[in-house]
C-alpha cells in the first residue's frame, strides 16, 4: 500500500509541469492548488479504502484531465437554462414567467450603469425608489399610490406588520391558503405579530360571520383569492364590495391578496378568467397585493396598490427597507408595466401571454417539427406520437382550468427505457424537462420558450 501512496504526486511537482502552468494561466494559482489538494486527499482515501489507485491517478494525462474538468466545473453556473415541456407555463420550480425583451434590456442597462434609483434628476434631490413604477401602477389600476417589495408573500407580511401587529385580522376559513413550500397565510400572520380570527366554514362564509367577529381589537378585514385551489358545490363567499361596505360601517380597512392577479382581461384573450386589478381597486378595497412574476409577466415582486394614506404608512415601516427591490428588478418591472399602456400588443411582447395564447394550428406545427427532430435521435425502443394535451397556467393561477394543447408523447415497452431517456434529456446542454402520465413521457409544446433553439440543439447533438 505504501507504494500506492508514493504514486500520489506532490503539489509542487504538479505546479512545475507544463499542463499545470497552463491551468494556472487559465484559472489562477489559488484555484489550481485548492483543487489539486482536494484531488490528492480523495486519492489517499481511495487507496485507504480500496487498496488501489483511483482511475484519475492512472497516468499524468488522466490526472490533468480530472483537474481540468473540476476547474471548468467551478466556473460553470449551475442554474442553467432548461426547456420547459411540462405543459405548465408558469412553472414555479423552473422560474415562472419569462421577461420581455424590453424588460431584459432595461434590467441589463441598470446592471451596467448607475441609474436614478432614488434621485429626482429635475429637482436634483433624493426621491423614492418606487416612484416610477408607482406612477405607472396608478395609471394602470386607478389606485392612488403603490408600493413594491420582493414578492407577494412579503407584501402580505408588510401589510400585516404595518396595520395589525398586536391586533386581530378577520378572514374566511375557506381562504386560509397554503402556497408552495408549505408556506401558509396563518404562518405569515404569526410572523407579523397579529392574531388570526377565522370566520365561517371551509365552504360557506357570510357577511354576518365577519360582522359578528368585529371588536375593538380588530385591525382590518382580509380577503384572500384562493388561486391555487377551488371549492365547488354548496358554497358561499363574501365579495370585496360587501366587505368594503362593512368596513366603512365600522371604520375598518379592507385588504385583498390576489396572489396572481392580472392587469388585463384574460377572457378577452380566450383564457380562463382571473381577478383584474382595476376591478378590485374600483371595488373600494383599501389595499390590494399581487405578484409580478405570474400573469403580469415580469420579475419577481410583490406589488401593493391602494389608498395613498395606507401606502404611505407601508413605505415608512422598517420592514419596507428589508423587503425592498433593487434597481435591476425595478427597471425590469417598470419596462413590463409599460407594455400594458399598449394592450393591443401584449400577446406579441410578453412571453407569458404569448405562450398562453398560441393557436392549436401553431402548436400542431411545433409538435410535428419536434417529433421529427426527436425521431432522429431515438432508437427502435421508443414510439413517438402527437396527442392532445391539457396545459396549465401554473404558479397557483386557476388550478382547475385547463388550456387545450398538443404534446409529443414517447412510450416504450419498458418503463426503465423511459427513465433512461429522461436521464439522457437531463444531460443535454439545456436539459429537457417533461412530465409523465399514462405510462408515457409528455413533451407539451405550449409551455416551451425558445422553440427554435430546442430544435437546433436536437439537430446538432
From Swiss-Prot:
GO terms for cellular component: cytoplasm. Its cofactor is pyridoxal 5'-phosphate. One of its GO terms (biological process) is conversion of seryl-tRNAsec to selenocys-tRNAsec. It is an enzyme of class 2 (transferase). Gene3D superfamilies: 3.90.1150.180, Type I PLP-dependent aspartate aminotransferase-like (Major domain). Keywords: Cytoplasm, Protein biosynthesis, Pyridoxal phosphate, Selenium, Transferase. Belongs to the SelA family. This is L-seryl-tRNA(Sec) selenium transferase. It comes from Glaesserella parasuis serovar 5 (strain SH0165) (Haemophilus parasuis). The gene is selA.
Amino acid at each position: 500500500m505504501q507504494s500506492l501512496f508514493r504514486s500520489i504526486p506532490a503539489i509542487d511537482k504538479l505546479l512545475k509541469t507544463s499542463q499545470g502552468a497552463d491551468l494556472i494561466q487559465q484559472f489562477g494559482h489559488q484555484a489550481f492548488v485548492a483543487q489539486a489538494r482536494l484531488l490528492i486527499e480523495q486519492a489517499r482515501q481511495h487507496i485507504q479504502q480500496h487498496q488501489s489507485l483511483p482511475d484519475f491517478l492512472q497516468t499524468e494525462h488522466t490526472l490533468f484531465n480530472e483537474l481540468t474538468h473540476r476547474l471548468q466545473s467551478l466556473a460553470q453556473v449551475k442554474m442553467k437554462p432548461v426547456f420547459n415541456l411540462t405543459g405548465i407555463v408558469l412553472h414555479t420550480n423552473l422560474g415562472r414567467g419569462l421577461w420581455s425583451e424590453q424588460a431584459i434590456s432595461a434590467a441589463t442597462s441598470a446592471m451596467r450603469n448607475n441609474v436614478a434609483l432614488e434621485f429626482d434628476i429635475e429637482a436634483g434631490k433624493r426621491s423614492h425608489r418606487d416612484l416610477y413604477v408607482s406612477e405607472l401602477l396608478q395609471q394602470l389600476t386607478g389606485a392612488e399610490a403603490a408600493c413594491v417589495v420582493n414578492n407577494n408573500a412579503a407584501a402580505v407580511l408588510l401589510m400585516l406588520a404595518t396595520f395589525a401587529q398586536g391586533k386581530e385580522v378577520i378572514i374566511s376559513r375557506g381562504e386560509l391558503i397554503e402556497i408552495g413550500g408549505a408556506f401558509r397565510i396563518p404562518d405569515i400572520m404569526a410572523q407579523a405579530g397579529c392574531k388570526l380570527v377565522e370566520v365561517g366554514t371551509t365552504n360557506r362564509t357570510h357577511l354576518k360571520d365577519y360582522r359578528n367577529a368585529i371588536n375593538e381589537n380588530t385591525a382590518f378585514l382580509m380577503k384572500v383569492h384562493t388561486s391555487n385551489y377551488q371549492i365547488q358545490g354548496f358554497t358561499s363567499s363574501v365579495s370585496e364590495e360587501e366587505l368594503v361596505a362593512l368596513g366603512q360601517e365600522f371604520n375598518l380597512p379592507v385588504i385583498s391578496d390576489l396572489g396572481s392577479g392580472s392587469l388585463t382581461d384574460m377572457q378577452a384573450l380566450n383564457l380562463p378568467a382571473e381577478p383584474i386589478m382595476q376591478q378590485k381597486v374600483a371595488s373600494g378595497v383599501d389595499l390590494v397585493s399581487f405578484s409580478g412574476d405570474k400573469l403580469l409577466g415580469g420579475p419577481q415582486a410583490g406589488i401593493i396598490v391602494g389608498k395613498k394614506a395606507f401606502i404611505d404608512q407601508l413605505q415608512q415601516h422598517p420592514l419596507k427597507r428589508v423587503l425592498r427591490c433593487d434597481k435591476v428588478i425595478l427597471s425590469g418591472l417598470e419596462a413590463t408595466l409599460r407594455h400594458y399602456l399598449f394592450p393591443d400588443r401584449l400577446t406579441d411582447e410578453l412571453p407569458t401571454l404569448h405562450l398562453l395564447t398560441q393557436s392549436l394550428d401553431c402548436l400542431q406545427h411545433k409538435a410535428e417539427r419536434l417529433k421529427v427532430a426527436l425521431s432522429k435521435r431515438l432508437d427502435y425502443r421508443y414510439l413517438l406520437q402527437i396527442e392532445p394535451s391539457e396545459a396549465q397556467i401554473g404558479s397557483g393561477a386557476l388550478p382547475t382550468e385547463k388550456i387545450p394543447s398538443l404534446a409529443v408523447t414517447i412510450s416504450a415497452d419498458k418503463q426503465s427505457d423511459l427513465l433512461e431517456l429522461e436521464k439522457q434529456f437531463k444531460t443535454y446542454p439545456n436539459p429537457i424537462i417533461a412530465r409523465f402520465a399514462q405510462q408515457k413521457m409528455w413533451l407539451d409544446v405550449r409551455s416551451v420558450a425558445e422553440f427554435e433553439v430546442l430544435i437546433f440543439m436536437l439537430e446538432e447533438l
